[in-house]
From Swiss-Prot:
The lineage of its organism: Bacteria, Bacillati, Bacillota, Bacilli, Lactobacillales. Catalyzes the attachment of L-aspartate to tRNA(Asp) in a two-step reaction: L-aspartate is first activated by ATP to form Asp-AMP and then transferred to the acceptor end of tRNA(Asp). It comes from Streptococcus equi subsp. equi (strain 4047). This is Aspartate--tRNA ligase. Homodimer. ATP binds at residues 220-222, 229, 477, 529-532.
Length: 582
């Protein structure tokens, strides 16, 4: 029989109609001879009533066989419920069953198919097809589908062309680790799965496409955490002849449209802008969460003359004030914060409490001479807790930025209903890598340096600034973009600054340098992490919740057991041998 509608769509206006529904048994109850079934499908749950006085013996026998997650087809008439269930959209009606067919049976599931079930992540991923049956999971993927639909329509209406770029590309340096694919035909050679379509989308601008977009899979072989996966999806944009401001305006309009159409929220435009240096100095992060205060305070000059070498000899002394919550933190709690701080390079964590106007704590005696200045500077009051880090500026900022976020979560200081977007601009072009002992691109080596700082490509690389911009939401980097280099000599200077010889640059990027000899237009763009955006829209804290079949923290799939061993024949065809090292 043909399904009449989704179970979750049945309403009062359907009373009196005979309909056919199909779905899964969510729950079965026997009450006084009557059998009640909660039938679940993609759109919701509908109560079925099977009365032995109204159905044949065969139907009743079939109903008695039903168990959770059986797949069934039912026919019956829609009736008003004697007692409505306000918790269900279908709660005013029920289906009086006249016909019932079991389409498939089901084993007892390893966990209940319901929201809020407590089960390990690996079990959820092992039985992902069951996990995805849960209503909250389905809602997240409806939200994801709606988001991509809005984005496509918005960009289509602005004249962007949706173009697919290659999945098998060339491995290049200056990025995360590549996923490599061996070539059977060109033995000993490898493709790389793209970390982004960066170069190919730039070449589309050289081809005259003017406005490109793509919702595209990307791959990075990097350490995983809550908002990262080895394969992820990004909304990728590139434009020709537009300024930094014009590109940001397009992106803001797109985000505003997504927020309005998916959440019913009007966001204020334009988004605030914050310089990179201000973000680091005041929030201790290049992706600041502006939903709460507790900004970093620079006390370097104020404590320079005190008799406490940890402070007086440090490059930077910075602090955060936990207002009105000193009594929430015991010595043991602060010891835990200290261990947390050490993860970010801090040697320790100094602290004091304000109790009835007096300073208490291990360093209080050293601050007697600056007590009034410190009280005024930090606007200290009773029951305030002050946490200090004395170290390099970078360590102080990073440590206090992480503490700021941790404490705000511990104390429920964050308004979770807020969506605070902002642009972080005026980025440094390079960042120093302790591991590599050299400067590396803060974004990528195709970013345009500012006209005012480009001369430092042959001088002090720390002074080179980029025409780059990141869009941030609630402490997460949603995406990043920039204007790009479009002239060969500038691109060659950039490669030299990064330590490439002319031969290495030509070997890795010769095709791009050659393309720049054929009238490459000024261009720029941006990429937004779709998984991360949907995660935040859905109120989740892990992008696994909005990816249908994600990997776990070991980059493996407990369901399919990927990655897996392959046959000797496959390895022979690729001329590969596996060496095992103890």
């Amino acid at each position: 029989m043909k399904r009449s509608m989704y179970a979750g769509h049945v309403r009062k206006e359907h009373i009196g109609r005979t309909i056919v529904l199909k779905g899964w048994v969510s729950r079965r109850r026997d009450l006084g001879g009557l059998i009640f079934i909660d039938l679940r499908d993609r759109e919701g749950v509908m109560q079925l009533v099977i009365n032995p006085e109204d159905v044949s013996g065969d139907v009743m026998a079939t109903a008695e066989r039903l168990r959770s997650e059986y797949v069934i087809e039912v026919e019956g008439s829609v009736e008003a419920r004697q007692q409505a269930n306000d918790k269900l959209a279908t709660g005013a009606v029920e289906l009086k069953v006249s016909g019932l067919t079991i389409l498939n049976t089901a084993k007892t599931t390893p966990f209940e198919i319901k929201d809020g079930v407590e089960v390990s992540d690996d079990t959820r991923l092992r039985y992902r097809y069951l996990d995805l049956r849960r209503p909250e999971m389905l809602e997240s993927f409806k939200l994801r589908a709606k988001t991509t639909h809005v984005i496509r329509n918005y960009l289509d209406n602005l004249g962007f062309i949706d173009v697919e770029t290659p999945m098998l590309t060339k491995s290049t340096p200056e990025g995360a680790r590549d996923y490599l694919v061996p070539s059977r035909i060109s033995q000993g050679h490898f493709y790389a799965l793209p970390q982004s379509p960066q170069i190919t989308k730039q070449l589309l601008m050289n081809a005259g496409f003017d406005r490109y977009y793509q919702i595209v899979k990307c791959f990075r072989d990097e350490d995983l955490r809550g908002d990262r996966q080895p394969e992820f999806t990004q909304v990728d944009l590139e434009t020709s002849f537009l300024s930094e401001q014009e590109i940001q305006d397009i992106v803001e309009g797109m985000i505003a449209k997504v927020m309005k159409d998916t959440k019913g929220i009007e966001v204020k435009l334009p988004f605030p802008r914050m310089a990179y240096d201000d973000a680091m100095n005041h929030y201790g992060s290049d992706k600041p969460d502006t939903r709460f205060d507790m900004l970093l305070q620079d006390l370097t000059d104020l404590v320079k003359e005190i008799d406490f070498k940890v402070f007086s000899e440090a490059q930077a002394v910075k602090a955060i004030v936990v207002k009105g919550h000193a009594d929430r933190y015991s010595r043991k709690d602060i010891d835990k914060l200290t261990e947390f701080a050490k993860q970010f390079g801090a040697k320790g964590l100094a602290w004091l409490k304000v109790v009835d106007g007096a300073f208490t704590g291990p360093i209080a005696k050293f601050l007697t001479g600056v007590k009034s200045k410190l009280t005024e500077s930090l606007q200290l009051e009773h029951n305030d807790l002050v946490l200090f880090v004395a170290d390099t500026l970078e360590v102080a900022n990073n440590t206090l930025g992480a503490l700021r976020t941790r404490i705000a979560k511990e104390l429920d200081m964050i308004d979770m209903s807020q969506f605070n977007f902002l642009w972080v601009v005026d980025w440094p072009m390079f960042e120093w890598s302790e591991e590599e002992e050299r400067y590396m691109s803060a974004h990528h080596p195709f970013t345009l340096p500012t006209a005012e700082s480009a001369h430092e490509l042959e001088g002090d690389l720390a002074k080179v600034r980029a025409v780059a911009y990141d869009i941030v939401l609630n402490g997460y980097e949603l995406g990043g973009g920039s204007l790009r280099i479009n002239q060969k000599d500038m691109q060659e200077r950039m490669f030299r600054a990064l330590g490439f010889t002319a031969e290495e640059a030509n070997e890795q990027f010769g095709f791009l340098l050659e393309a720049m000899e054929y009238g490459f237009p000024p261009h720029g763009g941006l990429a937004i992490g779709l998984d991360r955006l949907v995660m935040l829209l859905a109120g989740k804290d892990n992008i696994r919740e909005v990816i249908a079949f994600p990997k776990n923290n070991k980059a493996s799939d407990p369901m399919t057991q990927a990655p897996s061993l392959v046959s000797e024949k496959q390895l022979e065809e690729l001329q590969l041998q596996i060496e095992h090292h103890d």
